């Protein structure tokens, strides 16, 4: 029987060198790809059935072929490592353990489509992942050859992970999505009239699957997963489970098995109330837990696999509070280029907020929130308003009785539920959430907490400091300011 473990991405311990990675894989996939005709490699990617692991599940071979066959001969390869979907941490975990497979996959893609310009877009806060990528690039110079690979550090915004906004960041702009009718494989990087410069934009996990397909073949890759979604998937399981973590399993494992067997189930004998597949798909209720987690099966229940980040909420969860968190997150992260998106999500978020205040809660809040969410996707450049029009109404209509109770008892369930934006993971300890997200405002700035009276700077400190400044150095001025502040004289 063929050894399908060679297609798995995450080693037991992180690879500390390219040599260690190669000793495990046994073959140089990049060298093999260069010894094959690009069409032969593309045929193998097509035959493997590899689908994008970043959200939509688009066939990888189809995307590559679009760029390869584009009449413009200036082409780019772009890795989307700007992970930010709530409940997802798999790309960061992959880059910490195996950046070599990601880079090899990019080099192979470049060979197929005829590109020597490669970019990896990643959030500047991902310090460990950036360090591992840079070290891997240095160690792989011989394989990289005359290609150039640049790591581009970008902002914290959720929309940085949207592929058209990601290209804008690489070009030095804000993470604002381009018009929807210009996908990257038609208009890529640094485009100009007559030179659209198409780009392959794939998720980090997608690229990481490519080397093993080249080494072992499409048939071997298809021995894992399902016909709809071949191969393995990096699942992130968080929330109310005993063993939260990032788990690599064959695509199609039932969600119930992921929760109960892989992640240890819901603690204390509690029951699952709802599962979020990020904030991009319809929430999953207990009657759907036996669904296989591949793209097709999840679509059949009206939800989506997305980036395979599942957040489990037990039966103590108050759904209006969860809907409040989701609505606020999407409203805050909207870029305001499409007025219907920002205004619709503002309406939804504010209406749900008002249900928690006895001074503002009215019977109009529920229909107003539904209207706002459903009105958001009009002329949209990206998928964010569509997410709002799906996730928010699904929570509201699926648990309407809780919203009725909330209206009648506005202060009974006041404790907020944080949006599960995962900042770090430590095995055995679990996930840390991004504590700054709650302070983010709709203009993408951050609120600051009031300064306590005990540490407030006296209003006359500047004048007193100027009187005594003289020819003091900067360091001396800082010390003097501190002394004046502390002694009040």
Segments the model singles out, each with a brief description of its role:
Residues 1-20, 183, 190-194, 200, ...:
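Intrinsic disorder at enzyme termini
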Residues 447-459, 466-469:
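Short Lys/Arg-rich basic patches
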